[in-house]
Amino acid sequence: MTRRYWNIHLEEMMEAGVHFGHGTRKWNPRMAPYISAKRKGIHITNLTRTARFLSEACDLVFDAASRGKNFLLVGTKNKAADSVASAAIRARCHYVNKKWLGGMLTNWSTTETRLHKFRDLRAEQKTGKLNRLPKRDAAMLKRQLSHLQTYLGGIKYMTGLPDIVIIVDQQEEYTALRECLTLGIPTICLIDTNCDPDLADISIPANDDAIASIRLILNKLVSAICEGRSSSIRNR
């Protein structure tokens, strides 16, 4: 795997509050190697370790993007949702930022059926076909379309399982992480001091509750993805 420089600075991470963990009572002992101190009842994450694993993750996604791999970003809690969507759109990645529907990956055939239905309804709306239906039928299909847009809008162009999944908040997205583990899909996961660092392929110790922290980590990762895609185009 190519090792590159990703412009990761400890000062920048401190300003974003990446180092603030959970209260010392809410912690996973497996996170001990990634914690540098306790301050006012809060665990402080070792940002040197954060920088190391973030750099490794950037190397991984750069190489994967340069080989045309597909990415899925997952972060459904309110503090992560907007950052996940904007980061994914910027890097042309798929994303889930509202609710993880159980079996979204492990029961891919069902998800694929829903996506086909979603695409058909979108096409019918664009052509005006929905408006030519009886009012009751049109209203029902529009509600269905709205529901599908909310939960599948970020993966509407997915045609198969993703090659790498990036997860914000291991605890919140545990179902998504388990599905990736079941299917053997590589994962990169933001982990706070209450998480298990051994579950993901690359775990990045970071504050997963602060918007600035989430945004900073995602920005570094999607910048690496964008660079990887650009290098692929240049090398053709």
From Swiss-Prot:
Keywords attached to this entry: Chloroplast, Plastid, Ribonucleoprotein, Ribosomal protein
Record GO biological process: translation
- MF terms (GO), sorted A to Z: structural constituent of ribosome
Q: What is this protein called?
A: Small ribosomal subunit protein uS2c
UniProt cross-references to PROSITE patterns, sorted A to Z: RIBOSOMAL_S2_1, RIBOSOMAL_S2_2
**The UniProt record lists the keyword Transferase:** no
Q: Keyword Nucleus, does the record have it?
A: no
The cross-references to HAMAP family, in alphabetical order and at most eight, read: Ribosomal_uS2_B (MF_00291_B)
Name residues in a coiled coil: none
One term under GO cellular component: chloroplast
Instruction: Check the record and name the InterPro entries matching this protein.
Output: Ribosomal_uS2, Ribosomal_uS2_bac/mit/plastid, Ribosomal_uS2_CS, Ribosomal_uS2_flav_dom_sf
Major location category of this protein: plastid
List the subcellular locations.
Plastid, Chloroplast
Stretches that traverse the bilayer: none
What protein family is recorded? Answer: Belongs to the universal ribosomal protein uS2 family.
